[in-house]
UniProtKB/Swiss-Prot annotation:
The keyword Lyase applies. Gene3D superfamilies: Aldolase class I. InterPro entries: Aldolase_TIM, Indole-3-glycerol_P_synth, Indole-3-glycerol_P_synth_dom, Indole-3-GlycerolPSynthase_CS, RibuloseP-bd_barrel. The keyword Lyase applies. PANTHER family: INDOLE-3-GLYCEROL-PHOSPHATE SYNTHASE (PTHR22854:SF2), TRYPTOPHAN BIOSYNTHESIS PROTEIN (PTHR22854). CDD domains: IGPS. One of its GO terms (molecular function) is phosphoribosylanthranilate isomerase activity. This is Indole-3-glycerol phosphate synthase. It is an enzyme of class 4 (lyase). Belongs to the TrpC family. Pathway: Amino-acid biosynthesis; L-tryptophan biosynthesis; L-tryptophan from chorismate: step 4/5. It comes from the Bacteria.
């Protein structure tokens, strides 16, 4: 399979160049300054403190590997359903080309509930960090496979200066070593290889021994059943980012409750 991640990053750079023309930095700064902030990390910790799993529930219409996941896709309704059934936070895909996402979907989902929202996209430039704040995100994703360490550190610092939390995502030990140089407590382990899209939840289980106790491990991708959840919880993982299993269900929030509560 061709390297999907490299294709996505190339497209992102084209999108940034175009966006700078249509929405200059100064304009974005004004929009960003008008946004309120919700405590993403705090919402996860509150769930843990109450003895519950902390679920980052994803609003995702499609993916490159699975195609369209949900034909009847109304972000506001999905967000409300998640909030009513115990989600800690939302994750909303804003990538248009590969995931059929949209900044508009993030705005709609956030307006429909009180949950903090992660902008799920492939961030490679500070412009996208500011853009995330301007569209109303409370957190961003930084993917170690897509960024060198100095840039990742700079993007995190900029995000924190804007009041954004950072979820740093890794898939292997070498990426984890670099990710642990960041200040964020949130370390996501993606069970899906972004270069091949192969998925196994053993990826998370095999890396837990290398993560300090002061970090919050977020297991991402491939959590499809109650059995998967129980396996993770038995290993000490209590924070989950789940999309596909919910999106394929008739009622996403009810599926969340069935799997986790």
């Amino acid at each position: 399979m061709s390297d999907i991640l490299d294709k996505i990053i190339a497209v992102k750079r084209e999108e940034i160049a175009a966006a700078l023309e249509s929405a200059p930095l100064e304009e974005l700064k004004v929009q960003a300054s008008a946004r309120d902030s919700r405590d993403f990390v705090g919402a996860l910790r509150d769930k843990h403190a109450a003895g519950h799993a902390a679920v980052i529930a994803e609003v995702k219409k499609a993916s490159p590997s699975k195609g369209v996941l949900r034909e009847h896709f109304v972000p506001a309704d999905i967000a409300r359903s998640y909030a009513q059934h115990g989600a800690a936070c939302l994750s909303v895909l804003t990538d248009e080309r590969f995931f059929q996402g949209s900044a508009r979907y993030l705005e709609q989902a956030r307006a429909a509930c009180a949950l903090p929202v992660l902008r799920k996209d492939f961030i490679v430039d500070a412009y996208q960090v500011l853009e995330a704040r301007a569209m109303g995100a409370d957190a961003i994703l930084l993917i170690a496979a897509a960024l060198d360490t100095p840039l990742m550190i700079d993007l995190e610092a900029y995000a924190h200066s804007l009041g954004l939390a950072v979820l740093v995502e890794v898939h292997n030990r070498s990426e984890l070593d670099e990710a642990l140089k960041l200040k964020t407590p949130l370390v996501g382990i993606n069970n899906r290889n972004l270069r091949t899209f192969e998925t196994t939840i053993d990826t998370t289980l095999g890396m837990l021994d290398a993560i300090p106790d002061d970090r919050i491990v977020v297991t991402e991708s491939g959590i499809l059943s109650r059995a998967d959840v129980e396996r993770m919880e038995a290993a000490g993982v209590h924070t989950f980012l789940v999309g596909e299993a919910f999106m394929r269900a008739e009622n996403p929030g009810a599926e969340l409750a069935r799997m986790f509560f």
